[in-house]
Amino acid sequence: MDKILYDALTFDDVLLVPAYSNVLPKETVVKSRLTRQIEVNIPLVSAAMDTVTEAELAIALARAGGIGIIHKNLSIDEQARQVAKVKRFESGIIRNPIHLFEDATIQDAIDLMIRHSISGIPVVEHPTPEGCLLLKGIVTNRDLRMTASSDEKITTIMTTNLVTAKEGIDLLTAEDILMRNKIEKLLIIDDNGYLKGLITFKDIQKRKQCPDACKDSQGRLRAGAAVGIRANTMSRVDALVAAGVDVVAVDTAHGHSQAVLDMVATIKQKYPELQVIAGNVATPEAVRDLVKAGADAVKVGIGPGSICTTRIVAGVGMPQLTAIMKCAEEAKKTDIPLIADGGIKYSGDIAKALAAGADSVMMGSVFAGTDESPGETILYEGRRFKAYRGMGSLGAMSEPEGSSDRYFQDVSAETKKYVPEGIEGRIPAKGKLDEVVYQLIGGLKSAMGYCGVRTITELKENTRFVRITSAGLRESHPHDVMITKEAPNYSTSA
């Protein structure tokens, strides 16, 4: 038996071959699929890491057209709250608005506004046996500023002379009503006066600012969340579904394991319409088995991340480009999207990953340096950095809701009982996420122009690679010159 199967390559080993083109970069379309049922307007996904993705970054990325996967090093309630924050940030019509009953106090309103970062709350009667809520008024933060006592009933300050609209109103008409009446919130009711929804002027403005935002059928930003394989995982999934999550990622270092297959099947059995990403894998056999278990997308990548030490500690893995290509052959048979997770340093790597067969790319370090990431900001020798750590690092695994199960390790009170497969470090701060995304997508569009393709599908089907030498790689980077001013899309520290 031949132990050496084949040579395996990664992004730096190849270049895309330019082709005849009548396509300009600005004419390309970068819309792609995340899962069987979810499309993204840009093929970028943020990693489920505790120094990368929480609500703030997930909101920014969804507004740009991608999607964020909120990490699971959080309590179940907190992770669900993070998802809900994304879902409520921007809506067409808020179908189940946060509300107060008539016997609530002003302090209740203050607490609710602070907890959910909102500025107005409908006031309703206690629900009927059918669960209907009769609208009585609305209280806004302006009303709260006009009162001295927080113990008074909310009915003493709420506005009762309401401007409302009936179900089925379109957003253009709603905007006209808001403008004419100089109000910020339009309450939606049915013929009986029961509360059915809420449209805010702020949401309408947000839609105009980000026309390419990744949204669900109700006009809400899309959000994903990671889950593991612990005993309480289904409780976590229940809470995430209640919060409105669009997709859950069964997130482990080795997706081709029975525990992951069982968890995917369990989730799909209880929530058949919920989209489930499963991973990580590096072989076509793993893709086949996860698809059979019910996965709606498969995440590819064993050890390519900048903070991952799996290939060194365990001696196991697969160079990322070959892993994508091998997995894509199997995924194509069932039309299941692939997510290339890890190893992305530059926008050119995104183009290579997609050309190799991925439908989207998941990135950690690229986004960890943005202002919106939850990592700590560090000032070192006059430069700004952000903390960045692998989910296999000691710090991440030692958290109360830590990631040890991602690496199939038992929870322990002693850090020395963990065998880490990641490190902790810092990366240069990069500024706002939308500026980073602009450069990444600009680079991808440039690649598509060079290759003469208009869509991601054409990029996958109509491109070829050449293998390069170490000398070719050196020639590809700036050489024989001292860089005096770094470009926004190229850094020697990448």
UniProtKB/Swiss-Prot annotation:
The gene is guaB. It is an enzyme of class 1 (oxidoreductase). Catalyzes the conversion of inosine 5'-phosphate (IMP) to xanthosine 5'-phosphate (XMP), the first committed and rate-limiting step in the de novo synthesis of guanine nucleotides, and therefore plays an important role in the regulation of cell growth. The keyword Nucleus does not apply. This is Inosine-5'-monophosphate dehydrogenase. Pfam families: CBS (PF00571), IMPDH (PF00478). IMP binds at S306, D341, G342, G343, G364, S365, Y388, R389, G390, M391, G392, E421. Mycophenolic acid (MPA) is a non-competitive inhibitor that prevents formation of the closed enzyme conformation by binding to the same site as the amobile flap. In contrast, mizoribine monophosphate (MZP) is a competitive inhibitor that induces the closed conformation. MPA is a potent inhibitor of mammalian IMPDHs but a poor inhibitor of the bacterial enzymes. MZP is a more potent inhibitor of bacterial IMPDH. K(+) binds at G303, G305, C308, E475, S476, H477. Homotetramer. The active site is at C308 (thioimidate intermediate), R406 (proton acceptor). It catalyses: IMP + NAD(+) + H2O = XMP + NADH + H(+). Pathway: Purine metabolism; XMP biosynthesis via de novo pathway; XMP from IMP: step 1/1. It comes from Chlorobaculum tepidum (strain ATCC 49652 / DSM 12025 / NBRC 103806 / TLS).
